[in-house]
Design a protein with these regions (language model features):
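Conserved NAD+-utilizing ADP-ribose enzyme module
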Residues: 1-21, 43-44, 54-71, 77-207
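Short linear interaction motifs
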Residues: 5, 31-32
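Short hydrophobic beta-strand segments
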Residues: 20-30
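Short, polar loop/linker segments at the starts of domains and inter-domain junctions
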Residues: 33-46
Length: 207
């Protein structure tokens, strides 16, 4: 697929082959890849789909990957030198001529209704060629909190009854707390990244 995209986009105007802000990509890492990323500070990458929209990256494939995978959202700065823009689909979908052409040719476009006709520009997508993904490019780490019942038990100091659980639900909603899968960023993310790096280096003997 990547080869076909490259072939059909090679003659497009330059504005469809550049990005003007940072973009993001969610990856579900296996335990092996998590260790490789922590030990080597990078993972090999190739042609891949990115988005301008952090919210899209966070919600991709249902949000935080299931237990057993490590969810990571990488960020690429548009001024970084180590990537190439294959095609900026977001910019393409902002082009009225392209949108009109898609609409007029929709009967000849494979899976139009479930593909570009459905998503259109909702994913703010860019296709990049990236040699490596590094720990310094991690914008968010995915993880899971304890269950609601476990958290309520910690809060009340005992197994909560129905009335207490309702009160706990109220407190969670009032304070806008997410129970279950969540993304951590900033200083909290940095602490988790450093912990994973140190753990991976110990396990792989790369210290």
């Amino acid at each position: 697929i990547a080869e076909r995209i490259i072939e059909h986009s090679k003659d497009l105007p330059e504005k469809f082959k550049t990005i003007n802000s940072s973009c993001f990509r969610q990856v579900a890492l296996t335990r092996t890849n998590t260790l490789l990323l922590g030990a080597n500070m990078k993972l090999p990458e190739t042609y891949s789909s990115w988005t301008y929209d952090k919210f899209v990256a966070q919600k991709f494939n249902g949000g935080v990957p299931p237990v057993g995978y490590q969810g990571v959202i990488f960020e690429i700065d548009n001024s970084a030198p180590d990537f190439n823009v294959v095609i900026n689909l977001h910019e393409l979908f902002c082009d009225a001529e392209f949108v009109d052409a898609c609409e007029s040719q929709k009967d000849n476009i494979t899976s139009y209704k479930s593909g570009i006709g459905y998503f259109k520009n909702s994913e703010s997508e860019i296709i990049l060629k990236v040699e490596n993904l590094t720990t310094s490019q991690i914008w968010a780490y995915g993880g899971y909190s304890s269950t609601k019942l476990q958290l309520a038990e910690m809060y009340f100091g005992h197994t909560p009854n129905t009335r207490e659980l309702k009160h706990f639900d109220y407190l969670v909603k009032q304070r806008n707390i997410t129970i279950g899968g969540n993304w951590v960023t900033g200083a909290a993310k940095n602490r988790v990244v450093n912990l994973h790096i140190n753990t991976a280096k110990k396990l792989t003997g790369t210290q």
